[in-house]
Structure formats: structure tokens, C-alpha cells
Regions:
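A detector of single, family-specific signature residues
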Residues: 1-244
Length: 244
């Protein structure tokens, strides 16, 4: 029904379940929605959310219902169509369970690293992106200064004629670790979506966006600032630990 995944942005749960997939399993045909009255659908959707322990939004229900009323069904609402949808849902759930199991394993492995608590306390980082960052950056002591770690990621701003760093316009570099840059961009995306007002990286991103900087400029500049803070916090924390 519709491109239903675009209506839900909830992350997958630890058991692999996803709201949009569960929705598609219940409302497997557009007629499952549009044949109801709007009030009946809202009530049905609210009860479904309670039963599945998902957040309910009346405006979201109204949006979905309005879109469903505009659509013309391509496939008939019959047992064959229902079977096709069920098989697709089962495959999606199976893949999601595997992914979430791997994420759990990654997090358990990363939790044994000494820098784990300080990295996980950073805004924009969670049980998925945190372990990715630690794996891709490795031991921060191998970087002699903050500029070395940003160069490693390919988000260093470069040097101006006076020899000092210039951050007015920061393009994405083709050098460095593309995997780390991707993870850093994902962290920036989380910050933009969650907008933690007290976070210095988000404040910096918000300022650059307000200045109408191009997407890759403000994302790379934000990644640069995040990495510098990461480097400083992790080094300081590790230095404070008693020697083993």
C-alpha cells in the first residue's frame, strides 16, 4: 500500500521489527484503509499502535488516510495479493532480525573498549553509529593531533596561505576513509533530525545551514568539528584512566 515506508521514520527495534513493515502486514491493501471512514480508521490505527506498542499520531493517521483515498488499486484485494505481501513482509522481517543481531554483537564487542562510555555519551551517536565510529577510527593515540584525525577521515578543511586552518568553505575530500566519512555524515544527519540545542556540533551545523551553505559544505564542516571534539574527549578520558 502506497510507499508506506516514507510515512514512518521509527528505527528498527532490537528484535528486528519495524513499524512500517508491521503496518504493511496489517493494512496489506489500500482498501484496508480507504474502505473505512476516516474516524473508523483513526480508531483502528490507534488501537493497532497500542497493541504493537508504537507511538500514535492522529495527524499521521489522517495523512495516510488522505493519501489512500487518492490511490487507485493496481492489485485486487484477494488471497493471492495478501500472500504476496505476507511473503515480502516475512523476508523483510528475517533480514531485519539478522541486521539487528549483528548490531547487538557489534555493540557488545565495542563495549569492551576503554573509550566506549565517552563515545556513547556524545550526541548523535547510538548503539549502531558508536561502534562503527570506534571501529573505523581505531586507537586515537596513533593520531598526533586533531588535524591528523580529520585528514584521515578526509574532512580536513585544508590550509590557507598563512598556514592556518580555514573553515569558511569546507568541501568533502576524496582522500581519507570513505567509510568513516559516511558514518560521520550519518551522525550529522541524526543531529539535524534531533536538534539537541545544547550540543556544540549541532549549534555549528545550524549556523552553517542558516548561512545557506551547500549541503556537503556544512555536513563536512560539522563532521570536522565532531571529530576534533571526539579526539579531544577520548584522549582526555583515556589519559585519566589508571594504568593497567
Amino acid at each position: 500500500m502506497l510507499t508506506i515506508h516514507t510515512y514512518f521514520d521509527s528505527p528498527a527495534r532490537s528484535d528486528g521489527s519495524q513499524k512500517w513493515v508491521d503496518f504493511a502486514s496489517t493494512y496489506w491493501h489500500v482498501d484496508c484503509v480507504r474502505k473505512m471512514s476516516i474516524n473508523a480508521f483513526i480508531d483502528h490505527y490507534e488501537n493497532w499502535c497500542k497493541r504493537k506498542k508504537y507511538n500514535f499520531s492522529k495527524s499521521k493517521a489522517e495523512e495516510i488516510y488522505g493519501k489512500a483515498k487518492e490511490l487507485v488499486p493496481v492489485l485486487p484485494k484477494d488471497d493471492i495479493t495478501k500472500l504476496i505481501i505476507k511473503q515480502a513482509v516475512d523476508q523483510l522481517n528475517s533480514a531485519s532480525i539478522t541486521v539487528e543481531s549483528l548490531r547487538t554483537l557489534m555493540n557488545e564487542t565495542a563495549s569492551k573498549l576503554p573509550e566506549y562510555p565517552v563515545v556513547m555519551a556524545m550526541k548523535g551517536v547510538g548503539t549502531s553509529l558508536g561502534p562503527q565510529l570506534m571501529a573505523e577510527i581505531g586507537d586515537v593515540s596513533r593520531f598526533t593531533h586533531k588535524g591528523a584525525i580529520t585528514a584521515f577521515a578526509g574532512v580536513d578543511p585544508g590550509v590557507n596561505e598563512s598556514g592556518s586552518y580555514e573553515q569558511k568553505s569546507v568541501p568533502t575530500s576524496k582522500r581519507g576513509s570513505s567509510d568513516l566519512r559516511k558514518t560521520l555524515f550519518q551522525v550529522m544527519d541524526v543531529l539535524i533530525k534531533t536538534h539537541p540545542q545544547d550540543d556544540p556540533v549541532y549549534q555549528f551545523l545550524d549556523k552553517k545551514r542558516a548561512q545557506k551553505k551547500p549541503y556537503y559544505v556544512y555536513m563536512t564542516a560539522g563532521a570536522n568539528k565532531f571529530l576534533r571534539i571526539y579526539y579531544g574527549r577520548v584522549k582526555e578520558y583515556l589519559a585519566s584512566l589508571p594504568e593497567s
